[in-house]
């Protein structure tokens, strides 16, 4: 009351404060960071280790397992999972939430340094951190009209320019071939002079050096002396001297052909079917996609202005998606404001009343924006959606105050300025306790979110704080802006308001029906039990998912080819996949990037597409399942893609013995293939390929001074070549590679004919020290917490198939060492759902405590709390009706519902308590409902209708918060009925004759 009275007596001061609010609020919008999603730090570190030429089994044995053993006892590590593939080991460490990741990073680096000696010489593990916003910020396609060596041009001219941008963390180039100098050895000549590849590489390296040799005095100067033997032309390499083991000096040209050549550097890259060089750009963790986009586009314009033959196309820009998403949410918010003002007009019939509430909305939003910026939150889909939710909830307080002011005016005899002043002050005072109580109950439910450390806490903490900011701002607006505007505008309630007569008829009907219900309390209680039973029935069998995916209009086609597949077969598989993508009339453009044994097609769909992105992905998946020699997974890319997506059936088998696990997996796949209720059965080890394995005889090898490691290194050099040095020609750095002619060791017989040189210079055939055999090798080997795992997936052709497959196929094949495991997505869902369930339970308790303190009565608190369980029937029913599953956002909707659905009950019980001082209990129960039916309907309708645009999932990111809106719409709709018809009965049942008040001693 004191605040309201001060505001009414100092209007100029208030207006100036509001003006400052507008200025600082708008300023906060321009200074806020714009992002798709809140910046979430994933407590995960990834170890990458490359070992060229090693197969998955060797990688697992020599690299992955030693590292896993060393880091297995590290503090704070929750799960260790690894994938060993051809030439690469990737180990992911999932830490407990709340772990100091900087300290964890340092500890992990120290562990890796300690075991470096236990790893092969060429293996140098690297560690990188991960967060949810670490995807590609931009994708560029580069073409040039005149450059014949485009890869080197991009690598040496364009990439360095982009790397100067401070907001860029990483740049990856794909496609094209690079120029290099080939030192093509002649086998006969090498044998003639008894030389090895390493002899030639060392001679080339020694002939291209510059080293400091000290200092010398020259008069008054002290000059540095440098010894230089630099090769600057390709033809100069031919004259490099090489000393043979016999002491003879020969030239490089005597044993090798020297010429410029090209080789693939970045794999395959095509944009809309045309060969191109593609560049993917990742942002720094503390930067935004908007900053990266602006800086890159500016740099691209500079580069193209300097070179008219250069064309750089922005294939994908994440900032565009962010702006579109935020624009959609902003439009939804504006629509919610319009809906709220229209409802006010319907009930009061006076545009001034709509303006009063309309004035409080921007005031509350601006105060919230200032608070968001000060709290360090970004403007993203989550915080903007919170503002949309806030619009519906923040007008509740204003409506209650406005309706009370109208009622106070009707009771005033003075209709002049003094009368409006008194009505504004008195009307606000009557409901001040109710709006404070309802605001606190709404805000207090978000308190548990502040203590959640998991992904739920990181994602929804900004949403919770934003709604708290909105509700706090709305309370302040209701106590200040609404009374002041009421005094200034002097609105009058129209006698012929559109909802005037319907409300009067509704009040009359309510009095009659409530009079009957109070005579049939047992019937109401029986109906209550039926509602609870229906709630349980609706809740059972609901589909669950971690997070509803948004529709960004991007489809990701992940392609994994069989290891060792010939280049022409790879091209055939890629061409088939490209043909399916390019033939779709939904596609605007697409980018293919392939390297090693895997690649991806990123398809960017048209804005005016007629199909949902998920539907396009499902259609392509069916068409691509028949492409030979590869495994293809098609999915819709979303802002939450790091959470993964499950399509159809999936089971993960865990076992300690790989051979046994593989045998069981093959048997399960065979049995599933024979069934008709599943199709497209795939196994994570199905891309097996035969490899050539050298089984070294340690005794024979030692006799010639050889080891398995030295033999492996020699073969790797002979098959892959040695990078001996680098030349700078015409300003370009060109690698000099010592290699044998292409096809020299293409067949197994060629490899068997290799002659090795022992440490004593003695020659020995490879087959004398090792057996060359064929073995079946998996494309990759996966492990989780030390146990091997194989994933089997399939698509359903019928209903209720999962339980049948588990009972008829999976369970009978399990043994003592093999079990069913959970993937990371399922583990995450279980953990995050548990956290949200606890948060909801704590929120219910806090709401109970707040209301008990507000009413100074546990009894009244219990009465109002009954609205919570009964409102769930509306939430589950609407979820079932719309086909929306239970997800993190829908569970958050239940959390919000706990704090909002009780507001009508609070208003009703507070009014009954006021009326009981002048009325009997029965009359007070009936008249309180009839009197408050209008504000209850107004506040509920504004909240519910303002959420409808969000429930319709309008815009690309609309589906992210759709479940939240549906839960609240259904719950609040039923909550109105509970507050008006069931709470009065509970009040009557729990009411007792009040105890005699103890008089004050004073």
Label every model-predicted segment.
Residues 25-30, 312, 339-347, 351-407, ...:
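Hydrophobic transmembrane alpha-helices and their membrane-interface caps
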Residues 6, 37, 48-50, 90, ...:
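Extracytoplasmic/periplasmic membrane-proximal domains and adjacent transmembrane bundles
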Residues 60-130, 189-209, 230, 569-647, ...:
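Solvent-exposed, membrane-proximal periplasmic/extracellular interface segments of envelope transport
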């Amino acid at each position: 009351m004191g605040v309201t009275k001060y505001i009414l007596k100092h209007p100029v001061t208030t207006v100036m404060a509001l003006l400052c609010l507008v200025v600082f609020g708008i300023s906060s919008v321009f200074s806020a960071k714009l992002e798709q999603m809140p910046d979430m730090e994933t407590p995960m570190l990834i170890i990458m280790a490359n070992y060229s030429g090693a197969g998955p089994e060797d990688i697992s044995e020599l690299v992955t397992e030693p590292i896993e053993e060393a880091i297995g006892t590290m503090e704070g590590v929750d799960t260790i999972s690894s994938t060993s593939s051809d030439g690469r080991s990737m180990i992911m460490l999932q830490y407990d939430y709340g772990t100091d990741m900087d300290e964890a990073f340092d500890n992990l680096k120290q562990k890796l340094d300690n075991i470096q000696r236990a790893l092969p010489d060429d293996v140098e593990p690297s560690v990188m951190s991960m967060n949810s916003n670490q995807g590609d910020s931009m994708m560029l396609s580069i073409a040039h009209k005149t450059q014949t060596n485009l890869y080197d041009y991009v690598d040496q001219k364009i990439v360095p320019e982009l790397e100067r941008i401070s907001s860029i963390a990483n740049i990856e180039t794909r496609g094209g071939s690079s120029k290099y100098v080939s030192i093509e050895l002649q086998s006969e000549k090498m044998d003639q002079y008894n030389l090895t590849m390493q002899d030639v590489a060392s001679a080339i390296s020694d002939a291209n050096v510059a080293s400091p040799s000290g200092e010398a005095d020259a008069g008054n100067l002290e000059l540095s002396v440098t010894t230089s033997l630099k090769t600057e032309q390709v033809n100069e390499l031919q004259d490099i001297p090489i000393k043979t083991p016999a002491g003879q000096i020969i030239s490089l040209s005597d044993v090798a052909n020297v010429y410029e050549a090209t080789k693939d550097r970045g794999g395959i890259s095509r944009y809309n079917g045309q060969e191109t060089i593609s560049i993917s750009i990742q942002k720094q963790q503390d930067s935004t996609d908007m900053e990266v986009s602006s800086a890159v586009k500016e740099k691209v314009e500079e580069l193209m202005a300097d070179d008219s033959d250069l064309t750089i196309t922005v294939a994908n820009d994440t900032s565009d998606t962010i702006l579109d998403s935020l624009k959609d949410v902003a439009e939804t918010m504006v629509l919610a404001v319009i809906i709220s003002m229209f409802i006010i007009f319907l009930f009061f019939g006076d545009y001034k009343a709509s303006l009063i509430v309309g004035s409080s909305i921007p005031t509350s939003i601006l105060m919230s924006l200032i608070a968001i910026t000060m709290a360090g939150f970004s403007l993203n889909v989550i915080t903007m959606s919170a503002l949309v939710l806030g619009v519906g909830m923040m007008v509740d307080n204003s409506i209650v105050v406005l309706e009370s002011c109208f009622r106070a005016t009707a009771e005033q005899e003075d209709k002049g300025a003094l009368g409006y002043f008194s009505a504004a002050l008195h009307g606000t005072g009557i409901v001040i306790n109710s709006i404070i109580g309802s605001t606190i109950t709404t805000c207090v439910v978000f308190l548990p979110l502040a203590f959640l450390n998991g992904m739920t806490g990181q994602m929804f903490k900004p949403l919770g704080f934003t709604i708290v900011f909105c509700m706090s701002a709305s309370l302040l607006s209701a106590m200040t802006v609404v009374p002041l505007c009421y005094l200034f505008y002097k609105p009058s309630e129209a006698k012929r308001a559109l909802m005037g007569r319907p409300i009067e008829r509704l009040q009359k009907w309510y009095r009659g029906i409530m009079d009957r219900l109070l005579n049939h309390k047992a019937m109401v209680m029986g109906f209550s039990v039926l509602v609870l039973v229906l709630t349980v029935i609706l809740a059972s069998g609901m589909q669950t998912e971690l997070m509803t995916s948004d529709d960004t209009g991007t489809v990701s086609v992940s392609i994994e080819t069989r290891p060792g597949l010939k280049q022409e077969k790879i091209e055939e598989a890629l061409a088939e996949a490209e043909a399916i993508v390019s033939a779709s009339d939904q596609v605007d453009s697409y980018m293919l990037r392939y390297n090693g044994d895997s690649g991806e097609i990123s398809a960017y769909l048209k804005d005016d597409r007629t199909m949902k992105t998920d539907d396009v992905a499902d259609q392509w998946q069916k068409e691509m399942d028949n492409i030979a020699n590869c495994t293809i997974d098609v999915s819709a890319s979303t802002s939450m893609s790091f959470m993964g997506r499950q399509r159809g059936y999936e089971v993960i088998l865990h076992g300690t013995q790989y051979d046994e696990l593989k045998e069981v997996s093959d048997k399960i796949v065979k049995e599933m293939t024979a069934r008709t209720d599943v199709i497209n059965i795939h196994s994570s080890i199905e891309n097996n390929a035969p490899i050539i394995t050298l089984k070294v005889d340690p005794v024979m090898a030692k006799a010639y001074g050889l080891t398995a490691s030295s033999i492996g290194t020699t073969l790797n050099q002979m098959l892959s070549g040695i990078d001996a040095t680098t030349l700078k020609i015409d300003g370009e750095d060109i690698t000099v590679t010592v290699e044998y002619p292409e096809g020299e060791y293409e067949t197994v017989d060629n490899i068997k004919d290799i002659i090795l040189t022992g440490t004593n210079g003695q020659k020995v055939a490879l087959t004398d020290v090792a057996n060359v055999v064929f073995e079946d090798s998996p494309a990759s080997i996966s492990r989780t917490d030390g146990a091997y795992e194989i994933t089997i997936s399939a698509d359903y052709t019928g209903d209720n198939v999962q339980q049948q497959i588990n009972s008829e196929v999976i369970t009978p094949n399990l043994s003592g060492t093999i079990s069913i495991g959970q993937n990371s997505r399922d583990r995450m869902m279980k953990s995050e759902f548990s956290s949200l369930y606890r948060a909801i339970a704590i929120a219910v308790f806090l709401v109970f405590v707040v209301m008990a303190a507000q009413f100074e009565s546990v009894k009244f608190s219990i009465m109002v709390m009954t609205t919570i369980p009964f409102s769930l029937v509306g939430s589950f029913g609407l979820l079932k009706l719309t086909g929306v599953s239970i997800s993190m956002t829908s569970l958050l909707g239940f959390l919000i519902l706990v704090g909002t659905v009780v507001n009508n009950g609070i208003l009703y019980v507070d009014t009954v308590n006021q009326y009981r001082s002048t009325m009997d209990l029965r009359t007070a129960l009936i008249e309180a409902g009839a009197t408050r039916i209008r504000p209850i309907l107004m506040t509920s309708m504004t909240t519910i209708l303002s959420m409808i645009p969000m429930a319709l999932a309008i815009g690309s990111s609309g589906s992210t918060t759709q479940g939240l809106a549906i839960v609240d719409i259904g719950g609040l709709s039923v909550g109105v009925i509970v507050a008006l018809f069931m709470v009065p009965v509970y009040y009557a049942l729990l009411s007792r004759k009040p105890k005699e008040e103890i008089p004050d001693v004073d």
